[in-house]
Amino acid sequence: MLQALLIFVLQIIYVPILTIRTILLVKNQTRSAAAVGLLEGAIYIVSLGIVFQDLSNWMNIVAYVIGFSAGLLLGGYIENKLAIGYITYQVSLLDRCNELVDELRHSGFGVTVFEGEGINSIRYRLDIVAKRSREKELLEIINEIAPKAFMSSYEIRSFKGGYLTKAMKKRALMKKKDHHAS
């Protein structure tokens, strides 16, 4: 019974680590992924080793499977809280909606406005790049000012140039100055 409990706990630790490592790889953060992978591998070997010691012990197998499933739930929750990386939203509007553009820019979001031809009239599209950790804030602003906007989103693997890159460089310089001043 203690072995089954240990296996369950190890799976609840292992699977979220596996989830985070996978996300780091997808986000092209290979060094961080490799570091996390060390811990992941150690836990995996210990847990699976206990299960393989006695394959007739069904409690250990059930603990492994249920722990894996619970670990997936926990891993998804942790990933959403960490919100690693960046996201792009494409927002389609019937009018230019300068109020929305101004509010997004005032809130520190990079916004590019495009004018396009819809079936019956001119349409406007906003491309907005944001840290995933600010996605909720972004959606609140859009929903408050343009609740009927059509939105689609996708995650960014990498990017170069633009407003967001300049803003990040500025923040890094300010942190350096603050660090040297103290």
From Swiss-Prot:
TM spans (from-to): 6-26, 32-52, 58-78
Cellular component terms per the entry's GO annotation: plasma membrane
Main localization, broad class: membrane
Keywords, ordered alphabetically: Cell membrane, Membrane, Transmembrane, Transmembrane helix
Short name of one Pfam family: DUF5698
Membership in a protein family: Belongs to the UPF0316 family.
Name of the featured protein: UPF0316 protein BCQ_3166
Organism, as annotated: Bacillus cereus (strain Q1)
